[in-house]
Amino acid sequence: MELAIKDASGGLEVSEATFGREFNEALVHQVVVAYAAGARQGTRAQKTRSEVSGGGKKPWAQKGTGRARAGTIRSPIWRSGGVSFAAKPQDHSQKVNRKMYRGAIKSILSELVRQERLIVVESFALAAPKTKELVAKLKELELKDVLIVTEEVDENLFLSARNLYKVDTRDVAGIDPVSLIAFDKVLITAAAVKQLEEALA
């Protein structure tokens, strides 16, 4: 299959297995959820009644005071007591094998092509880190909410885009399923398309 190049005549020949496959919503959902789960810190920690300091001595006699019986001042029903079902640090990561992950990326790319949200350009670079220049370039292409993908890290592009709302830059190695679906359009260079195709082959 062929992808049209926005700023050049002709097109770019790409693999149908990468850019023309059927959209697998269940797979994409599973991979995105797993990716988001892996980003969780999972460091929350509370203390149970046995972990809170103090509370070793019985506060008052079992009988004869007229008060409710109590064995420790660190009971979960007491102020400053332990927590009944205390949260503990845990690993939220989910296993996603390589084939599934690549399948999800291909599925997303194919859907972007179908919806005409993947815009291929011959090259996209700035001579200096100028946000104004980048805004002008994006305006020319009628893009606002966009992920810019280049074949390698472009320092000028990164510095120019970091203060712009709904604009992000990535190199091919930095692409993930969440970033691909988070933006309205994906602007990608022809060299990055070929590099991405090789990585997903």
From Swiss-Prot:
- Gene3D superfamilies from the UniProt entry: 3.40.1370.10
Quick one: where's region Disordered? 43-71
One GO MF term, please?
Answer: structural constituent of ribosome
GO cellular component term, pick one = ribonucleoprotein complex
Biological-process GO terms, alphabetical: translation
What keywords sit in the KW lines?
Ribonucleoprotein, Ribosomal protein, RNA-binding, rRNA-binding
InterPro entries per UniProt = Ribosomal_uL4, Ribosomal_uL4-like, Ribosomal_uL4_dom_sf
Keyword set includes rRNA-binding: yes
> Does the entry feature the keyword Nucleotidyltransferase, yes or no?
no
Show the SUPFAM superfamilies listed in the entry. Ribosomal protein L4
Query: Subunit details for this protein?
Result: Part of the 50S ribosomal subunit.
Protein task: One of the primary rRNA binding proteins, this protein initially binds near the 5'-end of the 23S rRNA. It is important during the early stages of 50S assembly. It makes multiple contacts with different domains of the 23S rRNA in the assembled 50S subunit and ribosome. Forms part of the polypeptide exit tunnel.
Query: What protein family is recorded?
Result: Belongs to the universal ribosomal protein uL4 family.
**Name this polypeptide is given:** Large ribosomal subunit protein uL4
Organism for this UniProt entry: Pseudoalteromonas translucida (strain TAC 125)
Instruction: Supply the source organism's classification.
Output: Bacteria, Pseudomonadati, Pseudomonadota, Gammaproteobacteria, Alteromonadales
